[in-house]
């Protein structure tokens, strides 16, 4: 068997959690391959909203095995709270959740380092979630990190102390005013590590490749979005991992030729949390309407999301770097009520009109070129079939398909798993 990938194509918050939840019944294994608790996957069903930070979105299905791959970074404290939240629903998490020994751990001092680094930047802040993600990946690439498998070693606490002491020296270097009680943070951390030890650790690359040989179906779940990729995103306003399709291979230990379908998720408009360029951002009533109707607040941070029109230049770029084979369009219902919609089809850049994503898309460098499409007024939230959708929405969908040259197979018309239309 092969692996299918599910990726966000914008700046995150596209609705991956819901779609994974919808697709899970088709797969034996759901595997998360990068990121950490800075990303929240929101699922809504039976009138209850669930936000997962590290645990894969397939955990709510009875038969699916869920894997946290080597490319993920885990904060034991956040992870423990996530487990406790799931226990309220009488879920047997431990039998369905497997964790790669090669996944790296987020230490309390990683979070402190993150906060100190961001505070020292002043107006040049990149909008970090302050979850310790960046410093953890820095230690990983710097070959200083502590991995899940190290928990099982006799000298784990000594390894921890060596790295934490190094972090404290770095925090002092930033010379920012920070109040914290590291002793309390460490006590909480080591308590959470004991909880983590009660779960099953695996060599995920071995497990997944054996599963494929045994004919198991696998869905690899990405966090955040392609435009936040450390290499291909809007650097430096990006995350610290590879959020694109290639990240699934390195974050799980699967070969590129094992990837079959790449499902790309995007919103019918565009959003972004935190700092960074956003060419189609709206600062008027239309943007406020999108934010209000779409409930655009970060699942983890609670920060309001910036809203704007659909950017086809950025979307085509994301489709290209990921090799997307099918598109899933989310939140079509949010655009109901707009008389006219705008879509960015190009940029004015250095005196020329370009249809590709330039190296630098800061606002002073690019001006979006818009075309207008007719909006629709119908309430989509109760619709269940593609034929029921208003003609204007179908024309909007067909226009996007023509521009990006990839079919849209799913249209989401509401937050619940049942509000999903297959085309």
Model-derived features: positions:
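Non-transmembrane, aqueous-exposed alpha-helical and coiled segments at domain scale
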Residues: 1-423
